[in-house]
C-alpha cells in the first residue's frame, strides 16, 4: 500500500504499509504520480499494488508507458516552476490531470521511439531492482560483519 511520495525510492516505491482491503489499485508498470504536495514526484509500480489518495496511477492507452513517463517528467518541471513562482499548487485533481495538454506523436513514430527507448528502460529497471537487492544484502551483512559474527579471510 503506497500513500504518496514518502514511499518513493529512486525509481520504485518501497513498501512500508500493508492493507487487507484495497480500494484503489495500480498494476505493475503503472506510473505512480504524487498528486499531493510535492505534486509531480513519480515512481513506477514494480508489482500490482494498492494506492492511497495521494497518488494517481497512470498508463498509456497505446501501451507506450516509456513515452508517458518522460512526458510526465516534463510536467514535473512545469509543476516545480509553478511552485517556485509562488502559485499555490498543493494538490492536483483528476480534472487537473486530464486537462494537461500532451502532444502525442503519430503511431508509427511512437512505435519507433518505443523500439529504441524500451530496451534502455528495461535495463534501467532491471539494474534498479538489482540495486535494491544489493542494498538489502548490504544492510543484512554489514551489521554481522561489524559485530564479528562473520569473519572474512
What are these regions (language model features)?
Residues 63, 70, 74-86, 90, ...:
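Amphipathic alpha-helical coiled-coil/heptad-repeat segments
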Residues 1-104:
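DNA target-recognition domains and sequence-specific DNA-contacting regions of bacterial/archaeal
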Amino acid at each position: 500500500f503506497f500513500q504518496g511520495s514518502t514511499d518513493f525510492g529512486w525509481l520504485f516505491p518501497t513498501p512500508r504499509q500493508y492493507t487487507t482491503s484495497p480500494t484503489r489499485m495500480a498494476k505493475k508498470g503503472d506510473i505512480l504520480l504524487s498528486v499531493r504536495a510535492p505534486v509531480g514526484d513519480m515512481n513506477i509500480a514494480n508489482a500490482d499494488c494498492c494506492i492511497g489518495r495521494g497518488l494517481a496511477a497512470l498508463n498509456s492507452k497505446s501501451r507506450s508507458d516509456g513515452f508517458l513517463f518522460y512526458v510526465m517528467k516534463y510536467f514535473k518541471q512545469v509543476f516545480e516552476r509553478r511552485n517556485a513562482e509562488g502559485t499555490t499548487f498543493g494538490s492536483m485533481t483528476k480534472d487537473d490531470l486530464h486537462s494537461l495538454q500532451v502532444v502525442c506523436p503519430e503511431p508509427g513514430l511512437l512505435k519507433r521511439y518505443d523500439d529504441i527507448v524500451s530496451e534502455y528502460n528495461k535495463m534501467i529497471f532491471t539494474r534498479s531492482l538489482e540495486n535494491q537487492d544489493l542494498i538489502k544484502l548490504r544492510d543484512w551483512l554489514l551489521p554481522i560483519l561489524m559485530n564479528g559474527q562473520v569473519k572474512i579471510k
